[in-house]
Amino acid sequence: MRLLLDTSVLIDVLRLRHGRRELLAELVRAGNTLATTALNVAELYAGMRPEEEARTESFLDALDCYELTAATGRLAGSLKNKYARRGRTLTLADTIVAAIAIERRCTLMTDNRKDFPMPELDFYDLPEA
């Protein structure tokens, strides 16, 4: 399984919360691939504490990182537009992450499922944080 880690999970791993580091280690041992997006990396750096820099770099180096392509951008924009027409406001960041997960056929690992209403998405069932 290819897991796409959302920012909430990345932060939990780096701040040693909720046993997320151990969970990811177990998933890797079981043969799963861990990835994130360049957008999640930007969000992580935006809130990073100075003392977390080395640990953050080391952790991110161990992950695959998916970029935003023109095709992904079109899908993300279409998703945002589709839900806006239904009266649901989604952030562009979340629609980009969703589009990458859909295009790359990744299972999304997030604490914020409510931000990702797309039925095309598969989610990893995280234990309660």
Question: Which ranges hold each PLM region?
Answer:
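Nucleotide phosphate-binding site architecture
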Residues: L10-I11, A42-Y45, P117, Y124
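Acidic catalytic patch
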Residues: A42, L63-R85
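Alpha-helix capping/helix-boundary segments
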Residues: V9-L10, N40, T72, I96-V97, ...
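Donor nucleotide-sugar recognition loop
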Residues: R88-L90
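Short, well-structured N-terminal submotif of metal-dependent ribonuclease cores
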Residues: M1-T36, Y45-D61, A129
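Acidic, PIN/NYN-like endoribonuclease modules and their adjacent C-terminal/linker elements
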Residues: A98-A129
